[in-house]
């Protein structure tokens, strides 16, 4: 299960889209081509919003989503590029500042902080599905 699904009733979540990490007109990555995530660096807020909207629709992204302004205020305030995780407590203080992604990006640390604060979310083990009548194996004749 996702961290968001596990803790959305106890904590507020927000994703902020900052400047494009691997735009086609700067530092395109092969993985972007493979995943069909190819955008030029947005030059205005409308372009940035269009990319964010495409992402949220394409991936059915459930987390509330914000978009940094073209002065990159959120990116500058939080050193967010290319990706970074933060926890801001109820007093507006930074309670957790993750490392810059992708190499120091550890969602497991966010989960651990949330678990310590709100309690660990346990998921019951998935039980194997019972076979349907048509799927049941016929009894073998003894004999």
What are these language model-derived features?
Residues 32-36, 65, 72, 94:
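General secondary-structure edge motif
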Residues 52-55, 62-63, 122-130:
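C-terminal, non-catalytic tails of nucleotide-sugar-dependent glycosyltransferases
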Residues 1-59:
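Structural microenvironment flanking redox-active thiols in thiol-disulfide oxidoreductases
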Residues 8-12, 60-64, 82-83, 90-91:
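Loop/turn elements at helix/coil->beta-strand transitions in domains of secreted/extracellular proteins
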Residues 16, 66-68:
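Conserved beta-strand termini and adjacent loop/short-helix elements that scaffold enzyme active sites
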Residues 69-143:
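Thiol-/selenol-based redox modules, centered on thioredoxin-like
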Residues 42-43, 63, 70:
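Gly/Pro-rich cap/lid or specificity-loop segments adjacent to the active site
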């Amino acid at each position: 299960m996702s961290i968001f699904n596990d803790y959305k009733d106890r904590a507020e979540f927000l994703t902020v889209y900052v400047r494009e990490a691997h735009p086609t007109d700067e530092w395109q990555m092969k993985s972007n081509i493979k995943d069909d995530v190819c955008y030029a660096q947005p030059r205005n807020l409308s372009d940035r919003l269009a990319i964010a909207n495409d992402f949220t629709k394409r991936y059915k992204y459930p987390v509330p989503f914000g978009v940094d302004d073209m002065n990159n205020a959120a990116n500058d305030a939080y050193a967010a590029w290319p990706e970074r995780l933060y926890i801001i407590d109820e007093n507006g203080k930074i309670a957790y500042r993750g490392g810059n992604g992708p190499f120091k990006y550890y969602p497991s640390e966010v989960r651990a902080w949330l678990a310590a604060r709100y309690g660990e979310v346990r998921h019951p083990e998935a039980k194997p599905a019972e076979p349907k009548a048509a799927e049941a194996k016929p009894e073998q004749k003894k004999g």
